[in-house]
UniProtKB/Swiss-Prot annotation:
Membrane topology type: Multi-pass membrane protein
Pfam families: 7tm_4
Biological classification of the source: Eukaryota, Metazoa, Chordata, Craniata, Vertebrata
Record: glycosylation sites: 17
Function: Odorant receptor.
Family matches, as SUPFAM superfamilies: Family A G protein-coupled receptor-like (SSF81321)
CDD domains: 7tmA_OR51-like (cd15222)
Annotated localization: Cell membrane
Family: Belongs to the G-protein coupled receptor 1 family.
Official protein name in the record: Olfactory receptor 51F2
Length: 342
């Protein structure tokens, strides 16, 4: 069956709305117009997934194992890595399944679950970046009170509040998606479930879904972005009041990693929104490739940025790798000696 026939296939309402006995089945298109080359396109995507998963896992492992990194800044960094890791994994199975194995079918419940985690972790990343901006604000503007303001208990509360916020804004969106009826095309144009993509297939009024989706966006990234901007205005004002140019440079350098992380999250998001709004003349595969790449840019680049920019992370990674290598060699020597004496 061709992509055109799939997208035009009609399904009776009695069958489509029988979600309890037999959940609705949607078909993931992958990259429209590039079906013949999807296998080769998947290779760089797979490499990006490997880099994202291994890089963020390394950051989490290093922060967990190295006691010198048990500080507020690195706790927030581990939150960012955990979010990036989760964001990568929640689309990995369907994306590579579509590209490699033609596994295009996904039922409505699985689709809703994937959307919940996909959009939830995206909003979570925005919240973590805001928390990291607050960390930099306190470190530069109130250095003497840094450890008393950002205690372990307060950091845990910040992380929990971001999690609760995301669940609170995403749960109504998903519940109203569950109430939709679908009566025409069952083909999703991405390689994963995307909220806007799904509600456009509905044959019932989806205005409430659109409003809830917009509210979720504005109450998370729409709130976080201005707050991050405000924090850096206050940081710049504080840094410029420092008399020594060397101290000013050091203060700005402590923010470069976070500014880079904010840029690689918000700039692709803004670019993707502009392309969707104004790039109607662009081929459909351009939109889909951009959407897939956007999901992988922050998880791939964030570990690299923090590993390169922050010397403490570099030293901790090298230390952990050396210890692991030494432990492996020691075990090999023990095995060899045991074999000799036996």
């Amino acid at each position: 069956m061709t992509e055109t026939s799939l997208s035009s296939q009609c399904f009776p309402m009695s069958v489509l709305n029988n979600t309890i006995a037999e959940p609705l089945i949607f078909l993931l298109m992958g990259i429209p117009g590039l079906k013949a080359t999807q296998y080769w396109i998947s290779i760089p995507f797979c490499l990006l997934y490997v880099v994202a998963v291994s890089g963020n896992s390394m950051i989490l492992f290093v922060v967990l194992c190295e006691r010198s990194l048990h500080k507020p800044m690195y706790y927030f960094l581990s939150m960012l890595s955990a979010t990036d890791l989760s964001l990568s994994l929640c689309t990995l199975s369907t994306t590579l399944g579509v590209f490699w194995f033609e596994a295009r079918e996904i039922n409505l419940n699985a689709c809703i679950a994937q959307m919940f985690f996909l959009h939830g972790f995206t909003f979570m990343e925005s919240g973590v970046l805001l928390a990291m901006a607050f960390d930099r604000f306190v470190a530069i503007c109130y250095p003497l009170r840094y450890t008393t303001i950002l205690t372990n208990a307060r950091i845990a509360k910040i992380g929990m509040s971001m999690l609760i916020r995301n669940v609170a804004v995403m749960l109504p969106v998903m519940l109203f998606v569950k109430r939709l009826s679908f009566c025409s095309s069952m083909v999703l144009s991405h390689s994963y479930c995307y909220h806007v993509d799904l509600i456009q297939l509905s044959c019932t009024d989806n205005r409430i879904n659109s409003i809830l989706g917009l509210f979720a966006l504005l109450s998370t990234t729409g709130f976080d972005c201005p707050c991050i901007l405000l924090s850096y205005i206050l940081i710049i004002r504080s840094v410029l009041s420092i008399a020594s140019s060397e101290e000013r440079r050091k203060a700005f350098n402590t923010c470069t990693s976070h500014i880079s992380a904010v840029s690689i999250f918000y700039l692709p998001l803004i670019s993707l929104s502009l392309v969707h709004r104004y790039g109607h003349s662009a081929p459909p595969f351009v939109h889909i490739i951009m959407a897939n790449v956007f999901l992988l840019i922050p998880p791939v680049l964030n570990p690299i940025i923090y590993s390169v920019k922050i010397k403490q992370i570099q030293k901790a990674i090298i230390k952990v790798l050396i210890q692991k290598h030494s432990k492996s060699n020691h075990q090999l020597f023990l095995i060899r000696d045991k074999a000799i004496y036996e």
